[in-house]
Amino acid sequence: MLKNDRLLRALNRQPVDRTPVWLMRQAGRYLPEYRATRARAGSFLSMAKNPDIACEVTLQPLQRFPLDAAILFSDILTIPDAMGLELYFVEGEGPKFRHPVRDAAAIHRLGVPDMETELRYVMDAVRVIRRELDGSVPLIGFSGSPWTLACYMIEGGGSKEYARIKAMAFNAPEVLHHLLGTVTDAVIAYLAAQRAAGAQALQVFDTWGGVLSPAMYHEFSLPYLTRIAHELERGEGAERTPLVLFGKGNGVYVADLAASGAEAVGVDWTISLADAAQRAGGRVALQGNLDPATLYGSPEAIRTEVGKTLDSYAQGNGGSREGHVFNLGHGMSPDMNPEHVGVLVEAVQRLSKR
């Protein structure tokens, strides 16, 4: 039995006593205890692949702040890693793949990994975290979106131009669609396995959807997000596991995403929540969308911006605060002050009381 079900109620647009709050990258390098755990573990991957350490890191922010959810400590690139691309990290450069896929032959060789063998460490982490949370707050599981995973798989790492994947979109769209289809199959299986292991809400991160033109977004990202929303088995009625579709730069697509079949849409700070709520038209809950850079501001500035964000949502939602999960518009940065996170959480709780 969940002691705090605010997140699940808000994602299902049910009444809550205050707006729930959690933060993307709430378990991360801004916390000294995270840095100590990482130093002990040796690397990011050795933390993510050890269920007990992944659990320890997942719980760290909840031991400091009264957050309304835990999010699994993992990485969006676990799926391509399990497909054989071999993930590694370069200090200062981020994730890389030793075996990127750049032609039809390599793409056609890819298969959906087995979730309880190649990705068992993720499912074991979900199980351990659920046990340790002991019903205190819900656990969010997640995956990268098909488009975002394909970006990394083809580029071989992060990119500024996305030249390789965009060239494939123009020159061999059928090959790219084959890759996106395979990755979508894997994402659906991955999220279903996390749900079976105990995840109580699920989020898809379409981090790079915003680099596409509207026509390309509607061809190479949105249809695959919609397929996930339609095909991912999430249960029925009160037991249904809510699905959040988050994207950077997705504000112009809120109406499309609201029609996808997901329970909620997460937006970044480049659209006002008032505008996003009007576009959503009450069909989905909204999550977001404070600019993470606000945490560099003074405590007073943070409180002011939290109030503006809460009010913006209500303004676009007919005066009601229901159906909103407070979050940042993207993940936290390593140089942010943990005390400012405490200010943010306290402000959300105080200012959103019903």
UniProtKB/Swiss-Prot annotation:
Keywords: Cytoplasm, Decarboxylase, Lyase, Porphyrin biosynthesis. PROSITE patterns: UROD_1, UROD_2. Its main location: cytoplasm. GO terms for molecular function: uroporphyrinogen decarboxylase activity. Gene3D superfamilies: 3.20.20.210. It is found in: Cytoplasm. Pathway: Porphyrin-containing compound metabolism; protoporphyrin-IX biosynthesis; coproporphyrinogen-III from 5-aminolevulinate: step 4/4. One of its GO terms (cellular component) is cytosol. NCBIfam families: hemE (TIGR01464). This is Uroporphyrinogen decarboxylase.
